[in-house]
């Protein structure tokens, strides 16, 4: 790095200078959403908002001591029987804002197929299903999660149990509506669309239209979204009746207790700086965001070869493996989740200490959703964005939209350089292993599966190198280990 330090220093100075110019040129324009109640209302407890005692008890069991801002804003309207459209910053407690009124109504009028929740991703569907089950554990709730990548026959059996709540992705739900004998939603009382902007961005309009045609017009509808796009506005007009509008965020808002930094690095040492950052924060849970599925796998394999407890999560993994990686990270059996933007929205992983943008997000809103995986529910967190000489323009655009300059993350260059040789060796070995995996797939040969990586053997089995001498996470790889009122149908 010494032979290029001069040019790297010049690049850094240009970068810092351009940041200042760019931020003076442009003021962020945030999207203000109309509120029904403009005056500030004193914080109330769940009981004071009208939540019934069984559900207040359930909230307490889950550690929800007081309503979040979106819950404070949405629950009074929802409990009065109104349709609701809510915009809230990530990690704001949206699930509780729609689950509580649904369950309260279900207690008074128990029936099967009471509520349908539509989500854009499988992982979010499972998470919402788990939260419904946790809230309804004391009242005999039955919930079913219906998503792609899972056997249709097994799902048909789950629907035959006549669950109270169905949480589904639009495509698979339409498959069952069209093909599963005896299944219909003619008696549905609630429709909830969570992450509605993302549902529409993923081209589910055709499926949504089919679903809206076969459910009752006389229903209550809640629509929750991170942003108010033209498509969301159109969907609101088509599916909601005189909704109460609540908002606790703007388009590019991040939570106050999130410390945001950038680190400017030469592209050829990008992996080394990532290893340095993870070592600096050893013992903390971290999500590392990558741009592609291939990069995600390669970085995860590289980190495991260096002895770090990393698991991948991306769209090309089977549903079983995706849930396996997610559950290991959520249970703290693994410290590092390396993923694409599949994990950037909606997933509730409360213990994330740090987010690293290894690859630059393509849009400002993607940046907000990524860093929103940490500093959730009142906790503090740190987000560090890796900026190379090729990312400067995209990064300056993000800063301008945020309306603030991020602090530079200070590092000791000599300590980074100590890691170069081993990191480069691990990176090369990861490439070799990835190439072998591709060749095995093409040839159709079977190989022993690893719990974390799907089609790789125990990561780094041939090349694994501990990094205890680096003073960081280290170890031999591997896992940490060790570590009422009832309703009828």
Swiss-Prot record:
Residues 75-246 form the Helicase ATP-binding domain. GO terms for cellular component: nucleus; P granule. This is Putative ATP-dependent RNA helicase T26G10.1. A motif (DEAD box) lies at residues 194-197. It comes from Caenorhabditis elegans. Residues 469-480 have a biased composition (Gly residues). It catalyses: ATP + H2O = ADP + phosphate + H(+). Signal peptide: none annotated.
């Amino acid at each position: 790095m010494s032979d290029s330090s001069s040019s790297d220093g010049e690049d850094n100075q240009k970068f810092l200078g351009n940041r200042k110019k760019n931020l003076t040129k442009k003021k962020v324009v945030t999207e203000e959403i109309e509120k029904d109640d403009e005056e500030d209302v004193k914080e109330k407890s769940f009981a004071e908002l009208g939540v019934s005692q069984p559900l207040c008890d359930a909230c307490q069991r889950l550690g929800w001591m007081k309503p979040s801002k979106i819950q404070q804003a949405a629950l009074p309207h929802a409990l009065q029987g109104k349709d609701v459209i809510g915009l809230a910053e990530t990690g704001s407690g949206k699930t509780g804002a729609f689950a509580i009124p649904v369950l309260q109504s279900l207690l008074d009028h128990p029936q099967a197929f009471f509520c349908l929740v539509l989500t854009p991703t499988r992982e979010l569907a499972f998470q919402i299903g788990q939260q419904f089950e946790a809230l309804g554990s004391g009242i005999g709730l039955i919930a079913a999660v219906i998503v792609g990548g899972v056997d249709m026959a097994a799902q048909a059996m789950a629907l035959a149990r006549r669950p109270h709540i169905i949480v589904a992705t639009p495509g698979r739900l339409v498959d069952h509506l069209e093909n599963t004998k005896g299944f219909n939603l003619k008696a549905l009382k609630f429709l909830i669309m969570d992450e509605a902007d993302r549902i529409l961005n993923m081209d589910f309009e055709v499926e949504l239209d089919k679903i809206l045609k076969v459910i009752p017009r006389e229903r209550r509808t809640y629509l929750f979204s991170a942003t108010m796009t033209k498509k969301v506005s159109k969907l609101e007009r088509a599916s909601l009746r005189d909704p109460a509008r609540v908002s606790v965020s703007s388009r590019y808002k991040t939570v106050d207790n999130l410390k945001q930094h950038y680190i400017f690095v030469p592209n050829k040492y990008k992996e080394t700086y990532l290893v340095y950052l993870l070592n600096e924060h050893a013992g903390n849970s971290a999500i590392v965001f990558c741009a592609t599925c291939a990069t995600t796998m390669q970085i995860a394999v590289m980190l495991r070869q260096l002895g770090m407890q990393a698991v991948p999560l991306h769209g090309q993994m089977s549903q079983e493996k995706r849930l396996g990686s997610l559950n290991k990270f959520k249970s703290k059996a693994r410290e590092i989740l390396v993923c694409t933007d599949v994990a950037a929205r909606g997933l509730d992983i409360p213990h994330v200490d740090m987010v690293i943008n290894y690859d630059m997000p393509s849009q400002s809103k993607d940046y907000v959703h990524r860093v929103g995986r940490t500093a959730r529910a009142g906790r503090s967190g740190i987000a560090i964005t890796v900026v190379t000489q090729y990312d400067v323009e995209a990064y300056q655009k993000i800063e301008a939209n945020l309306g603030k300059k991020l602090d530079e993350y200070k590092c000791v260059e000599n300590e980074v350089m100590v890691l170069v040789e081993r990191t480069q060796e691990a990176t090369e070995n990861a490439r070799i292993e990835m190439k072998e995996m591709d060749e095995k797939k093409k040839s159709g040969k079977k190989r022993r599966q690893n719990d974390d990586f799907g089609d790789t053997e125990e990561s780094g089995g041939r090349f694994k190198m501990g990094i205890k001498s680096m003073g960081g996470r280290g170890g031999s790889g591997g896992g940490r280990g060790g570590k009422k009122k009832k309703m009828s149908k």
